[in-house]
Amino acid sequence: MTCTLRDLNSLLEICCRCPAHNPSTAFAPTTKVRVSSDVRGIFALPVQKDHKPYNGLSPEHLETMKAVSLMLDAAGPKLEDGISKAKELLEERINPELMRDALGIYLTHSKDAQQRKIFPPPLKNHPFFSTKTRRPANVAGEICTADTLHGHALLSYWRDDYDLNDSHYYWHMVYRGAGGDNSKNVGDFDRHGEVFLYVHSQMVARYETESLCWSLPLVRPWNQYDDFLENGYAPISSLIEHYGGYPPFSTWYSIRNPDMPDTLNVTIPRARLEEWRDNIYAAIRKGQFETTSKDKPLVLTRDNCLNFVGGILDAQYPSLNKLLGGCSLDEERYGNLHNYGLGKFAEMAYRNKPGEKSPYGLTISNFGAPRDPCFWRWYKHLQYYGRLAATRYPQDITAHRAEVVLSNLVVRLQDRSSPHYLDGHITTFLGPPAVNFMESKAKLGHEPYEWNVQVKSCRRSPPSKENPQTLTLRLFIAAEDLMNDYHSWIEMDRATVQLTDESAITKVRLDTDSSVARKMGNYGEPDPRYASAVFRHGWPQNLMLPVGKVEGMPFVAFCIATDDGIPDPAPAPPFHHYHDPRGMGYPFNRAWTQLTEDSTGKASIRTIISNAELYPFITSTTFKIYRTTKFETKQIIQPTTVTWFNTIRGYFKDADRACMRSEYGYDLYNYDHVMLHADAILDATASKRMPLQMGKYTQDNPDPEHPLWTVKMCENFRAWLLNGCPKGTDPA
């Protein structure tokens, strides 16, 4: 089913209702649109009892949501047009959860939104979050230790991490799938199916490594659909009102939860999913997927296998079919396994209670699904499809070797005074969680670290300034116990290097430089250089390292040099082309011919990456991660001398004050007003939306007499905010 605007009226009946309702719970009709405040207001709207439940995994609900996003886009060329239409639809009782999804897509991919730097608000703007502070709670929850919790509950601190869930929430705004025609709402994504497999496989690798740090077993994949969940799950107290839990030994219902209404395509029988599962496995083993043209199957190759396998799991048929030259994949045969599978888990927690706002379990929610332990069993199962394809289509890891010799790889703390600096080990810590951001048990972090490696060219024609040598360094880590499993390697960074002479260089990368990490601090704290939404779905900085062990847990670091360069990702649309020419997660994305063709039985990943003579473009080293505990997270953010009176007040011009008083009713010369709205001010100035330029001047061509804030000004304001907004002494 492909939705058009003509179909919208009938689809809206699924997720909205238009009876008499309390007007105070929605936007009042208005002719004036205040873009930033209206966007924040829409994302903060709670679901009311008279809203029809929204299931983000149901094809009908998804088509409605995508049609709403199209309506916002069709309302006019300016953001004001789309936001005005959103407010109109909310008056007609569109479910706010549906509108958040639709508006998030619209803002992420709208040219006007990108030019004006208006992005979807962070997760903390969701109505479930009652506070706006970025700072951890003063009264912390219990620190997580192995003798207080057992099994998957031990990892609740990791699953409930705010930054993990915020990252996942943004990922789904950028990458949309589930049967809709992406070319009609956000455009086609290059290698979208491969992205789907890679991202979720990396999530599983990180989660399993975290489990190993606590001596827990690896995740058991949900390969058998009549399996059961030994442990029950209940969302944290602030979510239990909104999403259901399930008791121990729960399993999928064979038909549907008997408490659920018999609504078409909200859930389907287990046997249908088993049929899709087996058909996809069979297609990978056979090396081809069936199409509607019996004599034109889609033949898998080394280059396309992961993209098509991932795309079919995620039901990205409209986009995939465009690659087939006139025929279509057999959707009846392969189905929509990913989303209906999550729906079967959500169905286990269904609550048939009058006025229930969201009767399903957390797996229907993009912002909260990783909190549920069943999420990880499901994605471990989906990883197996990638494993099967990766084994069937191996690769020669020398094919893209850079003509260099790598040596002296080191991963270590940045602090030279640390007792672990000379040993080349790293320290993590468990500190108090931000309970007001729905974290539980602890907050994982790490001391600042760096990695460096020596690079020397061995190219036949030596590099020079006139003829430089460009290459990419790719860094991974794995728990030493898991290093012989391709899919347990965690990607840490990719960096392009240019050599201009024969002498060896040492490439140094800080943890915050990582190309796979989010470019922001904890709790969505914006970085002025990376305010665009496209940078917000990387891996959280605080979770880049596994927690390790108190006595130190051994890890292996690996670096490979490939003969390519990776351009910086575009900060604004069009960003639909994946910028790395190699496979995602290369070289661990597929099996190695160096292993599959080995006849001695002695080859392994361990022996290959330690063989510098045969593979000089590869190097590795070992290090340990030591786990510590911090019972207090109070930090002093530099510079500490910034106060309201000596710095911040002077940042606001008379024109800024007049604009804010007119548009939003608060006074930028008033300390209390600025302190109350400091988060929004930092976000707007860091992303260059403010100070607002008038007349012939624009945000890209600002008035020299009324310039945008510099990076230093943003950093000072950030430090002032995080240090508690010190007032200082009035010089008057």
UniProtKB/Swiss-Prot annotation:
Catalysed reactions, semicolon-separated: (-)-cyclopenine = viridicatin + methyl isocyanate + H(+); (-)-4'-methoxycyclopenine = 4'-methoxyviridicatin + methyl isocyanate + H(+)
Residues reported to bind Zn(2+): H168, H172, H200
Sorted UniProt keywords: Lyase, Metal-binding, Zinc
Pfam families to which the protein is assigned, alphabetical: Hemocyanin_C, Hemocyanin_M
Transcription keyword on record: no
Family of the protein in this entry: Belongs to the tyrosinase family.
Protein name in the entry: Cyclopenase asqI
Protein's organism: Emericella nidulans (strain FGSC A4 / ATCC 38163 / CBS 112.46 / NRRL 194 / M139)
Name of the gene this protein is made from: asqI
